[in-house]
Amino acid sequence: MEHQLDPDQEESILITHFVNPHQFSYVRCIDVENSAMLVRQIEQDLKDYCSSERTKQVYVEDERVIVRYQRWSPPKLVRGVVRRRQNEEYLVWILDYGFNLCCSVWDLWPLPDHLSRSLCDFKEGGVALIAPHSGSVWSRSAIESLDKQLEDANQLTFQVVHRGKSNRNFGLLKFRSSCQTEDAANFLIKQDQGRCKETLTMAIPYEDISFEKAEINDMAIDTRPRLRRILELVVLLSENAKESTPTPSAIQQKKLDALLQSHETYLIPNSVKLLSKVQSISESSMQTALANRSKQISKELPHKANQSEDNRKKEVKYLESENLSECLSKVKLSSYQQKNTDSSTLSGPRNLASSSTNSNSNVRKSMTLFKSSGAHLTTSLSVPLTENCTNQSNNRTVVFSMDKMEQIFNDMLGKNPSERSVQKNRSQMPNSNVSTTKRCVEKMHVCRSENMGDRKPSVCLKHLVLAHSPEPVNPVTSYKELPLGNTILNAMDDLNFQTPLPTQIYAWPHLVNRGSLVLVNPSGTGRSWSYLPVICSSVLSSFENVTSNLDTRIAPGPLAILIVDSVENAKKLASHCEFLMKDFNTQNLKVVNTHAHSMMDVYMMLLNSCGVLVTTLAHLNNILSNELPLVNPTRLEFIIFDDYDRKRLDNAELLKEVFQKVNSIGGLSKQLVLVAQQWHSERFQKLLNRTTKPLILFGDFLEAALYGGLKFNVTLRSSALKARQLLDILAEQDGSKKRTLIYCKNQMELEELSAILIEAGLQCVDISKAQNQSPNRLMLVDDSQVRKQLPVRNIQLLIHFSLPESWLRFSRRFHTMADNIRNLFTKPIGRGQDLITYILMDENNAKEWPRIMKFLQDHGLTTQSMPDSEQQLDNTLPYCPYKLSNGNCNRNQCNKRHHFLKTDLPKIGNPLLQPGTLIRCKFLKAYDPAHMAVMPMKYKSKDSTIWIDVPYPSYPSTLVFKMSFGVPRKVHNPCKINDVCFVQHKELLSRVRIVDNPARPQVTVQLMDYGTELLQVKASQLLECPEQFRDLQQLAMDIRLSGLAGSGQGGMWSTDSIQWVQDRFADINEEIMQITVDFGVLDVAYVKEIALIEECPTMLTSVYKTFLRKELLRQGFAKIDSTSILELRAIHEQWKQEMEELRANKENIVCSSTDLDNRDSKITSLQNKQATCSSGKEEDLNPVETPLIIASPNSNETLEERKHVSDKVQNKIDELNDFNKSVEIEHVQDASPLDSSTALINTLIHELNTKSPTKKKNTQEFIKNIVHEDETQSIHHEISSSTNSLKQDKTIVVGPQDPPKELFLQYLNCATKSRESVYPMVKWHQTLTHIELVVEQQMLEYKLGLDGNTLEYKVNETTPPQRFILNLLGEVRIDSVKQHGYYLHIKLTKVGLLFHWPTLLNSLYVQKHAHWLIYDSERSHGPPPSFGLVLWEGYLTHKKTKSYSDSESSEFSSTPEDFIEPGVEYCEMDSNLYED
């Protein structure tokens, strides 16, 4: 289909993939029209090749695949080719629609070779005669604006003018809307996003296609307009083309003629005539067109009302006939829907009509199609993998493809095809008859079928779990097979609960049969739904079957007790139970959550009886300890512990106590459901011995192997020694015939290891011979060869030569031992095969060592000596977000760090988290009485008396509306830790930060602006956050009351305490919330106190109304618990001590500096430096010229080591300096600059006191030119005396304000002169929020660019050219650029926090080395005030002083004792804690 485009001809195109104006993929509309019919026909055939048997675990690049496109409704099957792989995702190019798709391996199948022929000719294109406005890279705004125009256009035309080296067509692209037609190049130029380029040669780099620019294969995302356009066009064109089919090729025509001229009569049964619509059979001809069967249907189905029902029955009957099976094995028909008018239903059969053909035109055979008057069959609500075939009972056509025609031809002529045997076809795809029958049965299933019980789950589904019980367990395939009741079934239907998990199909029928269950599986695997439907169904059955026994009917207590680990899970599971029973009307309490009511209310509810009691260990212990009979053992049916391991880690003693009380009331004899993450052999066996009909269900095969007595052996050695170690392990087996499996990481490692083992005399087999493996042969497998499971399940020795990418895959490897795991109920202990595994670790996967050791320790397995590198490796991991947010993390497979480091403490430059800082904030949310989310508004540092507003770039109350309106909704991809994105939360867009991105579909994010809680969302729900919102600081801050815990058991907070805090802080509009920071860690502020203040404006003071810490202790809601923050307190005290030592030694460190020019000279001793510092003399008044080097008493220390230590100390000193500047930023801003005479004197002093002889000589010559020759003798002494006087005057001291040279060169790196270029004169002025530059220009034309922190200005038209480069201190953006004559005014606005803005440009170094850059001292002073204004201000000050005895500075300086009011409680803590 290669077509050379005419450079002089415009053609209508469709753009399917747009990267930038110079790179997009397009296809001609005529090509889409010509190939639409074949594309649809191939897509209908793809469904036969998408069975579960044909799936693969890994696909390689350039492999042709079948893709399930989820974003189409319903999902459709398309063809694609793999371009790249990244972890579990694949980047696939869709062949027939021309775009990249990011999809998972579960949406891919191999594409057969005979269906891989390319049909559409997609080309690479670009807009000619255009270039980016600046540079060679297109800006994001240019790409988005043109992309939007192209998507909204009604028609696109393209005229090729040049072909690039990479076969990319550059031409004139025009888009036509309803009102006008515009050229793409002109559009970019008008938008100031492109510039005209006259040359046709486009040396534009080809941007690599990445996952970020690909479409995401998720049904929750709508199809983009450009993709929807081509998809709908293919469907429409194929339907319009059904009236005529293409003429077969010459070879196929000969085969058809030979078939039709055959004298053998090809008998077709009547049933096939009905399904294939064969009109008649004669000795010499056979019609394959559709015929009207309305007469036949009218004879067989006289009642029109039952037509649809009978049609379904007949179709199923015909599909099950033996004659049809025999016929379909030879003739395979593919059908698709036809659309005709109703008038054609009464027309008779028509003959085939063909038109004349020639070699250069498309030849089509016209065919009249008919539509019967019968009603259409109702389709199933969800039919997987059959979306592309729209089956209608009365609208079918028969199309013979090339392969099908060849098969008929070979059958009729008695030929035996060599390469297309029936066995090969059956091995490549499922039987068409069986699959068609199955699909029709699924379509006919519109209600709950009673025959579902006859179907058995697939073998692979059984192998996904390990189920052990005294009696065989019969799993189900659907919840509809269970007697759950209509209420539960309807609720499950509302949830669209279609495919149950393997653990659920075993747990449901066992619980229905009154059995007990121990389920071992990780969290997030649907464990709760393995028992919830059955529990709720049993509760509703008890409500319906009211007993006649009065004692049982009025018995108190619940029918089921559900014990969870946290308040959050209690709320979640209670809502699940309420949803399942929502349609059942009863006066009884169906669900009671003890954490949603006060304990007194809970007691009353239990006395009146209820259905399901959802509680925690602490509350259940109180209920069972109560004197009232709140739980009746005769009424109780279920006891569920979810999750056992989390309860054990939280409070093992309380868990043991609750088990004893439950056992004392006979609760363990009831139906027990115990959900855990780990197998605890001793404890669980005792529980199972007391239960009836126990079932142990494992979804985690690693835990199942430990249940079977697996012996762990873990080693950590160099990768070079692993092969030798493996040979030693195999030699230690003493010839015992153990079936051995060795896992490798990839194919290359497998081949290398196989060669080593064969060379050592061992026999190796691959995965293809897994079923016939003998014990003396080693089977080698790599992860890429394995799909979900291997066909072997009798391995005795499992060796992990390398670890997989995730812990989930590592756990799945142990399924190969499933058949050798002995059943605890049927086989005596001591029998069976020993299971052994070896994990060979090296430096490549050493980071998993701590996790494996922790896993072994949690299971009570002995571990040998651990390497010293464990702590170091563990410190590289990020801190666990769940532990930081909730205070604990009970996830068994958590791979995050659970201990704090010094690096977790806040930087000194962040005053909000410094000890002693007072913060006035706005209350957002209370998660518990000691954990809240607030929005800081003002703060005052510990040693300051000034309140400073928190500098938010955007007003907080309007930020949420700005984010919700006018922001493009694009899915954020890929998801990385700490990425900022949007999520739809409470009907508004909210900023969130990704804190955990596990291998599961859900991503853990944390709110940033109006809360700090963690949310579990799907990756498709994360939206792209524009850059203007991405860099804004977080509005919400997490605060915790340090050293305080709930008064309940295990430190839990009571419901009353939570309710009291919410009521107290819900409406504090007239009060101010003030917190006192104790210390901070990882953006969480641990506070000493949370106070509510009421201001008294008339008295110029304020009153403390509530101290939260004292109120919680006074009312008995809380207790002192300092153990929870001992680790944090110790790290903070150590860090505080280091900072104090740095402050004490600051002067010594500064005075220990040496000259930069004499870096290689001998370093003086530490004693000499201290003496120099104590005498008050400085070697160099300009610290910019001198680097900081710490003198070490160790003479063997190298210069590089000293330099490293000096840099480390200097960074800490700089942080201290920045902190002082941030606290007193207003004083720094108001400091008046030095006058010119003082600057000149300081410069001369610096030059004369330097160690460089050349500088001294040049300075003396300069002074000689100013003063007389006879006065030069005393100049040096006079300047020295001036030095002492300047040091005594604190107002003109310059040294401490100047930055060190290293920092100055880093912050202000002015461009050096290059050839004949010069600097323009620039005036600099800065405020707290802005920087203003005034540039003297020689020409009105200039170029100004801002890249990050670098500002570049250049004028190339002048001779010599002008330019300068400024590397600014912080990130800025250009606010305005104005031209006033030959002066260019540039205004820059700071981005981010405003208290990191030190002033550097009034230093001597700038005036000396950047002579072209001067500080605008006149503007910093401002115009002098008028005399009248001065008098008026003096009068107001005098009047104010006379009226009030105290000044305004003492407004908040009073202690709580100074304004005690009757009936108000105050905290008995240090008074300076609340001092403002």
From Swiss-Prot:
Its main location: cytoplasm. One of its GO terms (biological process) is primary piRNA processing. Residues 292-313, 339-364, 415-436 are annotated as: Disordered. Residues 339-348, 424-436 have a biased composition (Polar residues). Keywords: ATP-binding, Cytoplasm, Helicase, Hydrolase, Nucleotide-binding, Repeat. Residues 1317-1401 form the CS domain. It is an enzyme of class 3 (hydrolase). Its EC number is 3.6.4.13. InterPro entries: P-loop_NTPase, RNA_helicase_DEAD_Q_motif, Tudor. Transmembrane segments: none annotated. It is found in: Cytoplasm. Involved in primary piRNA biogenesis in germline cells. This is Putative ATP-dependent RNA helicase SoYb.
